Each structure stands twice: as C-alpha cells, then as structure tokens.
C-alpha cells in the first residue's frame, strides 16, 4: 500500500519532512526518494547493512582522531557496495515515512535507529564542517572496551545559516554577548552592533574576585591543582562563611560534574557539608533530569518558607543554561574555578583546529572566550530584573587577570571595584555583609524615576504628553468598596 500511494514516483510531502538538516538543504524535500530504498523491505535490508558497517568500525582498538564526512561516506559507499550515496541522505526521511505508514504510536522505542538514520543523513549531506571521531574506550577505564562514535559539528554557522537566508534582518540580543567580536566570525555574518548600558538606580550587584583563602593560600583551581587539598578546604570555608551571612538562596557552580563529585566528597569527610546544613539546606544537580527537577522544586520551597538553601550546580549544565534564581532564590552566586572545557577532548581538539584553519581564531582566545561566556551566564542567573540584587563571587585568582576580566559583560565589569580584584575569604565575607545590609531595604519607587523609570520630561519629550505630574507619577486611588456599584469596573479604570 505504501509503494502504491504517496511513494509511487512522488516527492516527499511536507508531512513526511523532519530530516535533521541543519540548514540550507530544504530543496532536498522536493527530490524523489531513491528507488533502492523505496520499498519497505529494501529499506530495512539497507539499514541492516548500515548497522553492520558501523559495528565493524567500532571493533577497532585505536582512536580515530578525526575523519571528515567525505572520507567516511566514501568508505561507507565502498564497503556497502552502494551505487551512490543518495540513499544515505534520504534514510532519515524514509524511516519517518515508514513509521507514519505503519501508524506507530510509540516512536520513542525507535530512537536508536532514528539516531543512525540521522547520522547517515548528515554524513551524506555535508562534506565540510563535520568530523567523525571514534573512541574505542573510556579514558578513565582504558582496559574495558566501550566504543563510542561521535559525529561532531565543528562549524556553528551551519546551525544559523537557514535563519540568515530566510530573514532579511536578524536581531541577536543577550546580556552575556561578550566579547562580541568572536560571534560574527564563528557564525559567519557581518554585524551591525549596538551596546546598551543597563540602567540601575543603585548598586544592586556586587561582583568580587576571591584570590586567597582565609589562610592566605592562593586559590587557583586549574586542572593540575584540582585535587589540591588546601584549595578544596579553602573553598569549603568560603562556602560555610557565605552561607552564614547570605539570606535565603545561594547557587554554587563547579567547572564539571567530576570536579563537583570530588569536592563534595572531600567536604563530606571534613564536615564542611555538616556546617553548611546548620545554615541552609543543600541540594545538588545531577545528570538525571528528573532528580534535578525535584531538587530545584525543593530548593525553592526551602527558600519560600525561610529555611534557606544552597544549590550545587555545574557550568554548562541544565541549571546554568536556563534556570533563573531571581529574587530570594539567588542572593549570591559563587563560581569555583573557571569553567574551561576539557582540553584533552578529541572533539574540542578537532573544533579548535577547524576554527584556527578557517577563521584564524587562536586556540587560547577561543577557550578563554568560551569559559568567560559560561561564567557570565552563571553570574547572570541571580539578576533577572532591575529590582533584584545579589552577590557575584568569582573564586579563582585567574579572574583578576586582565585577559579574563575584560571578557566579562560591561554591566558586570563596571561594578568590579579595584578593591574587589584581589580579595581574601575574610574580606569577601565582610564586604558581603556590608552590601546586603545596604541593598536589602526596599527602594522607594519615586527614587527610580529618571533612572530606571521614565520621568515626566521623558514621556512628554517622546510623545508630546502634557498631563499633570500627579497623574503620571502617582497611582489613581480606587474608590471605597461601598461606592462601587455595577459600574465598578468603569470606576476602577
């Protein structure tokens, strides 16, 4: 029935679309499905050959550093004895059509084969911008075979290419687009940039760089020092003392899950966590989405009832990317170390090599740009409105260097005082007390007029409004309840 209907020499319909094309391949939806995979039985046999080929490639014991798509696809075509690679390109669409025809409801159970057909499509559709990397084992357990095949996208411009092609004007806006000069290179577009200052009526953020512990030992959580006991203990003292002075919620970001596990284990044995729980409840982000969601709900509940809580999270994790800790949920954020990517990663090495070759972007510049972008996102989690306030603590001496500090967004950088560039734990805690005692009082809205709220002159100048000041600057009082009748709504207006 399938071959006699929509597939009898007809192009794929929009309903069958859904290929994993990143951008610029929309025209393929109008092409014909290759005859060698048009019949369902032929397509199933074809996919078995694809799976056998991938299994054979994963049997090796040596790491395949990076293979471009064209080379890998050529090997697939030769090994599978295909006349042309067109069948690979349409495998994803063909599977979706087959599942649609069979009226499969539980599509999730076909996710493994969906991953394979998406892989085939991308391999055949893109000759540049991707690399295939095969790792036969986990570096932590080199004696146990655990093969993994990566299809790494090295060119970020492929993802946004279709957006630029379909729309004449594209506005990219964020509070953490800093430094902005690398984005046009990486995304391959010519920008017209405009930076707007953040209007604040008071010093509602207090960024501080803690470079020394309470024992004056330097804090530098670079990869070689991450197991240093003195650094871990000093981080623990900073956490305990901040929990004692900061009300409501706090968020602590670690560079990676592995480092968080190591530090939390050390803190548990040295009673740091026990001291923390005297002031606040403790919640930890995990790689399980359900567990993390429950932890966030309970964290907010603890803050709502006044118990206070601290949330341990990971930069580049779910919480750092999209969860807001506004108002009393985030009165302080502490970033332990700098969230650099794992520099020994094969995928990262391939990406750095690609960007250096195509865009002349130095490896060190990109790594610093990426790390500071992540740090900025973590810091911005606690400030979500102009009436919000919070502490931002960068606990690593490397943040005090100009090459790191200048890559922070200007709205954060301009609030870093010279006296906050090289602080010890004791000085940081003392400054935190002073800051919180100053900003914790609610600011009268009248003092915000002309700074973060429009004044009468602003409105009259832009719209030509000539109303009485008391109408613009004071809310109209509602009549007493006894004066409201059936026309109550009109009176309220």
Residue locations for each model-derived region?
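ASCE RecA-like P-loop NTPase motor cores
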Residues: 1-493
């Amino acid at each position: 029935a399938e071959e006699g209907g929509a597939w009898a020499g007809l192009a794929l319909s929009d309903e069958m679309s859904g290929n994993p094309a990143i951008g610029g391949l929309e025209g393929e939806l109008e092409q014909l499905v290759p005859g060698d995979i048009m019949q369902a039985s032929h397509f199933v046999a074809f996919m078995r050959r694809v799976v056998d080929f991938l299994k054979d490639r994963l049997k090796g014991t040596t790491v395949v550093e990076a293979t471009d798509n064209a080379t890998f696809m050529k090997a697939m075509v030769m090994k599978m004895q295909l006349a042309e690679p067109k069948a690979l390109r349409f495998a994803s669409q063909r599977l979706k059509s087959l599942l649609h025809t069979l009226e499969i409801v539980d599509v999730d159970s076909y996710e493994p084969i969906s991953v394979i057909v998406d892989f085939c499509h991308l391999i055949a559709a893109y000759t540049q911008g991707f690399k295939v990397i095969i790792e036969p084992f986990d570096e932590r357990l080199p004696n146990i075979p655990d093969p993994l095949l990566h299809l790494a996208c090295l060119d970020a411009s492929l993802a946004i290419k279709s957006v630029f092609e379909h729309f004449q004007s594209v506005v990219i806006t964020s509070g953490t687009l800093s430094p902005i000069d690398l984005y046009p290179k990486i995304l391959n577009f010519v920008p017209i940039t405009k930076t707007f200052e953040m209007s604040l009526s008071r010093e509602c953020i207090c960024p501080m760089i803690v470079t020394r512990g309470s024992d004056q030992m330097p804090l530098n959580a670079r990869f070689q020092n991450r197991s240093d006991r003195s650094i871990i203990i000093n981080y623990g003292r900073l956490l305990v003392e901040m929990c004692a002075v900061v009300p409501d919620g706090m968020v602590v970001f670690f560079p990676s899950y592995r480092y968080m596990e190591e530090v939390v284990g050390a803190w548990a044995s040295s009673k740091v966590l026990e001291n923390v729980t005297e002031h606040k409840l403790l919640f930890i982000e995990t790689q399980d989405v359900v567990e993390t969601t429950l932890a966030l709900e309970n964290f907010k509940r603890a803050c709502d009832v006044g118990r206070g809580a601290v949330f341990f999270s990971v930069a580049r994790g779910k919480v750092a990317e999209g969860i807001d800790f506004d108002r009393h949920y985030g009165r302080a954020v502490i970033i332990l170390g700098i969230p650099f990517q794992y520099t020994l990663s094969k995928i990262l090495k391939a990406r750095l090599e690609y960007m250096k070759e195509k865009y002349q972007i130095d490896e060190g510049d990109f790594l610093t740009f990426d790390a500071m972008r992540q740090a900025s996102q973590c810091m911005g989690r606690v400030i979500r409105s102009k009436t919000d306030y919070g502490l931002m603590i960068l606990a690593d001496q490397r943040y005090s260097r100009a090459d790191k500090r200048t890559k922070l967004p200007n709205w954060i950088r301009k609030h870093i005082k010279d006296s906050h560039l090289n602080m010890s734990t004791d000085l940081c805690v003392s400054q935190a007390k002073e800051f919180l005692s100053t900003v914790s009082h609610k600011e009268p809205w009248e003092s915000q007029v002309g700074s973060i709220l429009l004044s009468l002159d602003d409105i009259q100048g832009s719209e030509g409004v000539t109303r009485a000041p008391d109408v613009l600057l004071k809310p109209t009082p509602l009549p007493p309840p006894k004066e409201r009748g059936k026309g109550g709504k009109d009176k309220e207006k």
